[in-house]
């Protein structure tokens, strides 16, 4: 089964990330405080939202978090959450990715479609790509990172070198 979302292009995700940064009073900050955003700002923006930090054994080893639309919750593995607090780039991106799912699925009301034909959706219809792109735009806004190297982006935005390179390629 393939899950397909309503199409949304990067330019709209970029605008949404910019709006979230503005609403959170972090529009010009290179280092976006994702933990503070999820803990303090998301409950103000989305009153039914809550975050649950789960024991590492709650998820299978390769799963770091989940967004459960019906429960209005993001569940994140404890080691990932603690890593995000410490500023570990991959863990910050994971938390931003789950926040991206939440915003797109709960707050924006995007629809899912299921296909049993096994085709891979175009990136702009793939909910994983959408959350990844929104997370990247939130943590590494294009207008602030333009002209920087991937190493500079990773350092000032608090993301992994891989995430920085990916974002740089979309400026």
Question: Which role fits each region the language model picked out?
Answer:
Residues 1-171:
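Active-site hotspot residues in diverse enzymes, especially metal/ion-binding acidic/histidine motifs
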